[in-house]
Amino acid sequence: MKEALTSLFEKVTKLPTTSGCYKMLNENKKILYIGKAKNLRSRIKSYFLEKKSHKIKILMKNVKSIEVITTNSEYEALLLECNLIKTHKPDYNVKLKDGKGYPMIRITHEKYPRILKTRKIINDQSEYFGPFTNVKKLDQVLDFINKTFKIRKCKKKSNAPCLYYHMGQCLGVCYKENLEKEYQIEVNKAKSILNGNISEILSQIDIKLKLAVQKEDFETAIKLKEMKSSLIEINQIQIVTKANNLNIDYVYVHPGENVNTIIVLKYRDGKLVERDANFDESICKKDELVLQFLIQYYTSINMIVPDKIHIFLKDVDTKNVEKLINEIKNTKTEIIYKETKEILKIMEMAISNAKLSLREYENKSNKALESLKIFLEMDKLPKIIEGFDIAHLKGQETVASMVTFKMGIPFKENYKLYKLNSLLKGEIDDFRAIKEAILRRYSEIINKKLELPNLILIDGGKGQLSAAFSILKSLKIEDKVKVCSLAKKHETIFLITNKKGINLPQGHPALRILQNVRDEAHRKANGFNKKRREKITLLYKKIDGVGEKTAQKILKLIGTYKDILPLSENEISEKIKVNIKLAKRIKEFAIKENSIKNIDNDK
């Protein structure tokens, strides 16, 4: 328990000192507690101090990981905390009741709009500003707007002017007609202030403030000073919660040397509820990566597609991607790009979170590689790992794959696929297959004077490991590169120097790296084998009378056209259970295919 907390504390000491929110999670990734902080590192470190309340002690016993979202200000962190708690309802947080969020300013969608305070968003085309954490200051600003601009307060039409009209605070729209243009001017003035255009108003307040001080009217001076403070505070650009009913995702790509970080900031009902960090190796250009990511991310089975997807890339054609997502998911989402003051602030937050996520990701990879180095008794960090796997279907079309990982991340530019030639048709010999793949790969590296990997991973057990090592030894590079194997049954790691095997706990970062390499090699080998088989069956289907099932039978029970050549028509008929006429056509096809290949080889 103490060791786990010590490890977690080490990660906390590397957190940023900026403002933001943090999520404490248990071993099942369930969120236990959400908090905010002006200084994330300092606040989270306080949970590890000896003097803790009983409740915090219980909480910390269950905390296995901590995630953070950075913000541009403490104010944004406060609002974000509220939204996250409402969304996730963690066990250790106070449960906020629905409808009791922070207040907003609403400009109603009416002939003569009213300006009101509200805690609920109504989908009636009203305009909303906020929310605002300081209710007192919000009330002061509303009072200022109502007294400065002639906005109606009455809800119903009247036959006589109200008190506000007589006080000069209303145009009298409750009983007068045709005041739309004049009234809209007053509304626009109020909107201008709420949109942050307050410099002129502040100048006027400063003049009045000086006059009040000169007259020693300190009561008025205090009110004017409070009003100035309120206007400044509520007109801070608020980017964590945007008061509208849209569900919108902001997708930002942060390019890196070895890996790109893709951050998705998710707003639901106008509220930021989640930061999703994704990582991809740096092969594609930025615009290509964004388009590929959008397709893979938003067409996945469990992904809810928002109303709009905002990308931070200009002049990228997203029409086809948008159409594809909408067709697959039966939605009407829009992929957009805009440049506004508010969106630039969101981009700043996305960049901050992307950098943080990348640091966390790289720290995890480095620690995992350090562990792997120790377990495998290596002198150097396994920065470059090459993984091998063999695939076949009952000895047919045996192939090998070689994948490369750099710093724990796939490096696809370096992948290799091998069609193996050392095995006879139908022969299953993984050891000989491994030998051929290793020989071809490392003979090429030696001849071309390329860089050797730090570690070679073989999918298999002791036999496969010995086969690979024998080739490395024959090439005289057995001392220059470490080789190990990973057996699927118990995920046991075998070394030449330790054939008893190493069994790491499931989920161990070092084991996970090896599993990722093994699984990627497995995926590539199986994909190549399948592609080879599909190519052959496609050829067989050109034969008159051969469909998919018969083509599969020929491949499975006989093999390629070369395997057909030595067989008689009767043997073909008997092996795949077809009539003699079809067997004859199959034989003729094989002879023709062979002659074409021979002509091609002579050219």
UniProtKB/Swiss-Prot annotation:
Subcellular location: Cytoplasm
PROSITE patterns noted in UniProt: GIY_YIG, UVRC
Domain of life: Bacteria
Residues in GIY-YIG domain copies: 17-94
Sorted UniProt keywords: Cytoplasm, DNA damage, DNA excision, DNA repair, Excision nuclease, SOS response
Gene3D superfamilies in the record: 5' to 3' exonuclease, C-terminal subdomain, GIY-YIG endonuclease, UvrC, RNAse H endonuclease domain
Position of the signal peptide: none
Database matches in InterPro entries: GIY-YIG_endonuc, GIY-YIG_endonuc_sf, GIY-YIG_UvrC_Cho, RuvA_2-like, UvrABC_protein_C, UvrC, UvrC_RNase_H_dom, UvrC_RNase_H_dom_sf
SMART domains per UniProt: GIYc
Family: Belongs to the UvrC family.
Function: The UvrABC repair system catalyzes the recognition and processing of DNA lesions. UvrC both incises the 5' and 3' sides of the lesion. The N-terminal half is responsible for the 3' incision and the C-terminal half is responsible for the 5' incision.
This protein's name: UvrABC system protein C
